[in-house]
Amino acid sequence: MKLLNSLVLLAALCAITANGKIVEDTPDPSTVYNLFQLSSSDGGCDPAGTHSPDANVNVSVDKCRNVCNKNIKISKGTSTNQFTFQTYNDNSCSQATSDQALSFTCSDNVKKQLGTSIYSVICSTGSDSTNPTSTPSTTPSATPTVTPSTTPTVTPTVTPSTTPTVAPTVPPTTPPSTTTGSGSTVVASFGLIVSILLASLAL
């Protein structure tokens, strides 16, 4: 632990200058000064104003770009913060023109004239731009497909109707006849009664 604290203290002392300020490490130029803003007034751009006579475009290091109808590429040099500007005959930047390659160092926000090419460069940071002379392809914006929300169908609960139970109609039971004897017996008895009555009247 003591050794670690000593190393931290030693590093802090080494980073302090005589005036008491912290010395910042020099940024890596390949990551800080990696973009360049170019402009041209050598007639490569449309002088009638259809396009701006100054084509401002960010160009990444080692990327072939067409700026004002000229193919250019800025390459990283051999020493720190050194770059090379070169024009090419082809759009893949493999055939250099007869123009001499220009070597320059990059200082942030300092504009540099690049020889007879009348290109200028401002070292800056940002995103690689598209070619200013090319018409960007118009990609139609895709209409998002709206998926309708599927509301679940609620099946209604059917309550069965309670039909009252109808009691079956029971026909009244006919009580058995209490008359005894057959029909002939009744007739005979009636005849006997009539005979007795007639006999009584005859007396």
UniProtKB/Swiss-Prot annotation:
Keywords noted in UniProt: Actin-binding, Cell membrane, Glycoprotein, GPI-anchor, Lipoprotein, Membrane, Signal
One GO MF term: actin binding
Oxidoreductase as a keyword of this entry, yes or no, is no
Low complexity bias (residue ranges): 127-168
Q: How is the protein modified post-translationally, according to the record?
A: The GPI-like-anchor contains a phosphoceramide group, rather than a phosphatidyl group.
* S-S pairs: none
Q: Which residues form the propeptide?
A: 183-203
| Entry-listed glycosylation sites | N58
How the protein sits in the membrane?
Answer: Lipid-anchor; GPI-anchor
**Cellular component terms (Gene Ontology):** plasma membrane; side of membrane
Give the domain of life: Eukaryota
Q: Where is this region: Disordered?
A: 127-183
Renumbered to this chain, the signal peptide range is: 1-20
Lipid modification (GPI-like-anchor amidated serine), residues:
S182
Cellular localisation: Cell membrane
Q: What does this protein do?
A: Binds F-actin and nucleates actin assembly.
Q: Which family does it belong to?
A: Belongs to the ponticulin family.
Protein's UniProt name: Ponticulin-like protein H
Identify the species of origin. Dictyostelium discoideum
Q: Which lineage is the organism of this entry classified under, starting from the top rank?
A: Eukaryota, Amoebozoa, Evosea, Eumycetozoa, Dictyostelia
Coding gene?
A: ponH
